Amino acid sequence: MSPWKVIITSAFFTLFASFNQQAATAGEKGTMDFVQSILIANQMAIEQGDHKMIAIVGNGTITFSNSDGGPFTEGSSATLSVIAYIKQTENGMNLESPMSVSDASGDKLFMVMRRSTGTFDSGGGGQGRAELGGGTGKFAGLTGSCPYEVNFLDGGNVVVRATGCSWEKP
């Protein structure tokens, strides 16, 4: 074989192998669990006719466990900021709680916690659904969801546990 054919063939196979490796890592996905520990910094309620609107602001930490890789390092922790808003009527409640999680590198994960059952006072809690909605850095484009359970403790402390969170990056 001529030297040019060897060079061209080698270059082709190198590019092909490189492309295949990139394609294999482009569609990353996995599972993880997390625990959040949140301290409520402020809470306010406004009554309006047949319903009450409640806003809760808090800060805390999130720790990832049972991770099978990707951007969620097993045992790693990050800080979080959260704003919850709740509409409460005699028929129940509707809670939506967006949060921003920042890891040590400065990358941010955006999450929204939603639930329509349970309570939000000390000793209360309930179950809902956590949605992962992208972020910055290693979390950019990431989506996913999982069930969670929240417990409101004395002193404005809140504990959230989520298991079986499925996530993927396109």
Q: Which residues does each predicted region cover?
A:
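Positively charged n-region of N-terminal signal peptides that target proteins for export
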Residues: 1-6
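Bacterial N-terminal signal peptides
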Residues: 7-18
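Membrane-interface motif at the C-terminal end of an N-terminal transmembrane signal
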Residues: 20-22
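Beta-strand-enriched cores of mature, soluble protein domains
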Residues: 24-170
